[in-house]
Amino acid sequence: MLTRKQQELLLFIHERMKESGVPPSFDEMKDALDLASKSGIHRLITALEERGFIRRLPNRARALEVIKLPEAMTSSIPPRRTGFSPSVIEGSRGKLQAVPSAPAKQVEEVRNSSSIPVMGRIAAGVPISAIQNNTHDISVPMEMLGSGEHYALEVKGDSMIEAGILDGDTVIIRNATTANPGDIVVALVDDEEATLKRFRRRGASIALEAANPAYETRIFGPDRVKIQGKLVGLIRRYH
């Protein structure tokens, strides 16, 4: 039997994975549960792991997977009405496989896909030059895309590792010019630097927040930052 805090954390991780395809950071979990420190989150995650509700994914920074939900929680979760269900796609020796973003889903080979352009590299670290032209196309599952126009970018850097985004990943981006606080976005700074960061507001300013304590949050005036798109999923290949 889970405690109330354990249930709250499990549901928060589950819902975030369904929404964005990547697990929440420890800071986000701490804030969501109104805890004073991240040590409390560590204890809750350990307890959930010991009871078989989640597991930590090896060789990834703080990456988690929900294995199951208690029956009482499953029956109380309303069906989602969003038009798409972003997820992480992992490739093994060239074959793409869908990694389930909800419990009890079986991993199956992706059949229905759409081709989208890869527009170059995006910095998850120190911003690099602005997004380049189309370099090649990749196939992405239709269920990841939903509505709107999409493109892909190859990630360079480690500033988003606590959001489950690693150096070498390919992120799937939906075209957008606006974002909500907490969204992971492609931001163009001063019309010349492109970076992948979490979008925040600091009064009238815009904060581009990393998911790695080694990187500082960067603050800009609203006229210096243009939103180029929002993260809907990512692709990871193993060679």
From Swiss-Prot:
Keywords: Autocatalytic cleavage, DNA damage, DNA repair, DNA replication, DNA-binding, Hydrolase, Repressor, SOS response, Transcription, Transcription regulation
Sample GO molecular function, one term: serine-type endopeptidase activity
Positions in coiled-coil regions: none
Enzyme Commission number: 3.4.21.88
Transmembrane regions listed in the UniProt entry: none
Annotated site residue numbers, Cleavage: A124, G125
Gene3D superfamilies tied to this protein: Umud Fragment, subunit A, Winged helix-like DNA-binding domain superfamily/Winged helix DNA-binding domain
InterPro entries from the UniProt entry: LexA (IPR006200), LexA-like (IPR039418), LexA/Signal_pep-like_sf (IPR036286), LexA_DNA-bd_dom (IPR006199), LexA_repressor (IPR050077), Peptidase_S24_LexA (IPR006197), Peptidase_S24_S26A/B/C (IPR015927), WH-like_DNA-bd_sf (IPR036388)
A Gene Ontology BP annotation from the UniProt entry: DNA repair
Catalysed reactions listed for this entry: Hydrolysis of Ala-|-Gly bond in repressor LexA
Keyword Transcription: yes
Short name of any one Pfam family annotated for the protein: Peptidase_S24
Function of the protein: Represses a number of genes involved in the response to DNA damage (SOS response), including recA and lexA. In the presence of single-stranded DNA, RecA interacts with LexA causing an autocatalytic cleavage which disrupts the DNA-binding part of LexA, leading to derepression of the SOS regulon and eventually DNA repair.
UniProt cross-references to HAMAP family, sorted A to Z: LexA
Family: Belongs to the peptidase S24 family.
Description of how the protein assembles with itself and partners: Homodimer.
Entries under NCBIfam families matching the protein: lexA
Entry protein name: LexA repressor
